[in-house]
Amino acid sequence: MFDFEQQLKILPDKPGVYLMKNSLGEVIYVGKAKILKNRVRQYFQKSKNHSEKVRTMVKHISEFEYIVTDSEMEALVLECNLIKKYRPRYNILLKDDKIYPLIKITLNEDFPRIICARNKIKDGAKYFGPYISTGAVYETMEVIKKIFPIRDCKLNIKKGNVKVRPCLNYHIGLCKAPCTGHISKEEYGKIISGVMDFLSGKNKDIIRKLKEDMDTLSENMEFEKAAELRDKIFALEKIIEKQKITTGGFEDEDFINIHSDEKDSCIQVFFSRTGKIIGREHFIIEDTQDLPKGEIVANFIKEFYGGTAYIAKTIYVPEIYDVQLLEDWLSIKKDSKVYIKIPQKGDKKAILNLVEKNARTTLQNFKLKFIQDKKMYETSLEELMEILNLDDIPHRIEAYDVSNIQGVDSVGTMVVFENGRPKHNDYRRFKINEVKGANDYESMKEILRRRFQNGMEEIKRIKERKLEFSAGKFSFFPDLILMDGGKIQVSAALEVLKEFNIDITVCGMVKDDKHRTRGLIYRNEEMPLNRNSNIIKLITRIQDEVHRFAVTYHRSLRSKRVLHSVLEDIPNVGVKRRKELLKRFLSVENIKKASMEELISTPSIDMRTAESIISYFRGYKS
């Protein structure tokens, strides 16, 4: 039994990180402290200043751990890493941990290329962005390639040493073919300078020059070429139009603001590059009632910039906690000075107000859709209760599926819907261990046995310790079980429930010959469902989700197995390097497509190893 009184007494008066755990040993909160003794003790002192969220969390704390650091900066870095590792339920977590793509010009090559990059590294290249999506990157790159005839091949072209046959791009005017010596390094460099001017926002001169060329072609009655230039100008202006809002500066800036209602918050980020707003992103953060705005913004910055590939030079916010600490942390990550500013008036304040207005609108729309969806889900669940003759609405529904190819890499999955909505934190994946070959019936029984055996054991441990109930991985049992399949799958589930003496309604989800959800199998009879009903929409969504989750897990296992076996054959790639490649690129296809720069930027991969990998895949037949 954890002795709170004793552990609170011996807390050190040093900086560090603390981890709060529930009765099942799961980390439910990670925080940092300038003085551990003071910060951790605050949670266990009765105070009206505690938010509802903190009071709820404290009820579920069964023990805590702490890690002492040499400085508050070290504590901040460790806190960010541990939050990413454990994803604790009471920390502010962004719905997606995306890395925003960049446009990279490989100035470290004699004849540079323009490519999409995920990480910014010190390799002599020039980076622009970040962009809001890879779609925005490729759209911009396509326009650039139409206007500026630069190469997009992966040939290692050195000045004067490569003579090959030019590719199709040369013949259709999209490349000057430096691979054949048709253009000098100096002339090619002028084209690249134009690309960098465009990406830096110096667009007026480029458009003016294109229009002059178009007029000249028209005067010379070369109307076809003039029309081509007209289309290029239109495409260029279309890209520029998307960056119409200006910020009055020429540096890279991010504008962050927040709007909160009585329960939730929306944080909006505007990305400004060289004085133009190039994109925006929003994040809905739930259960922020009673939390100060400055604390929410500080926590958001830690998570958002902890994962992004690019940090702007200046970040504007309405208010914030730990501003100096966060500035220092961001500056270390960027390797140059980063400023966090709170504008009081002027253009920056006006833009920040615009960001807040957008956050307010986004939150209102989110809530409106939530209410509309809630009504639809309630209707669906009520209909489901009626047709199955249940005593109550099935608030928690669990669905199961099995996936394999000829019995190889057999996996099972469980998805959870609460009140009609997916509860992703409760999704579970199972490797089939005991069943050999393609046997869906026995595989399904293995999955369900493990699920309910784990649930019974968790509940027993909680009761034995006489602790307040805390949801573990399997502690909550469903009101309804849906099997992706027919009578065989339903029979497997009922047999396992009988073993555990558990009474839960089980249905099978069946599809028609067009692979659309058709109806439910219940008590050995098929119940057809109206294609326009709310209930079929819910069942279809659940069936599609459990199937997607199963297939995705199966593919990931298969990909890892194939990747592992392939990498074993590559010279200079040992166990450590295989792990790093797998961690970075995830699939064999991504490894095969990786550029020299991307491979070298992977931990433990040097130039010799990268060349070995590229050489191997040139001769590899998948």
Curated annotation (Swiss-Prot):
GO molecular-function terms, A-Z: DNA binding; excinuclease ABC activity
Broad class of where this protein is predominantly found: cytoplasm
Domain of life per record: Bacteria
Gene giving rise to this polypeptide: uvrC
Record protein name field: UvrABC system protein C
Pfam families registered for this protein in UniProt: GIY-YIG, HHH_2, UVR, UvrC_RNaseH, UvrC_RNaseH_dom
Subunit annotation: Interacts with UvrB in an incision complex.
Residue runs in coiled coils: none
Domain UVR: 204-239
A biological process from GO: nucleotide-excision repair
Alphabetic keyword roster: Cytoplasm, DNA damage, DNA excision, DNA repair, Excision nuclease, SOS response
Stored NCBIfam families: PRK00558.1-5, uvrC
Localisation per UniProt entry: Cytoplasm
Free-text function comment from the UniProt entry: The UvrABC repair system catalyzes the recognition and processing of DNA lesions. UvrC both incises the 5' and 3' sides of the lesion. The N-terminal half is responsible for the 3' incision and the C-terminal half is responsible for the 5' incision.
GIY-YIG domain mapped to chain residues: 13-92
Organism from which the protein derives: Clostridium kluyveri (strain ATCC 8527 / DSM 555 / NBRC 12016 / NCIMB 10680 / K1)
PROSITE patterns: GIY_YIG (PS50164), UVR (PS50151), UVRC (PS50165)
Record bears the keyword Protease: no
TM helices/strands, residue ranges: none
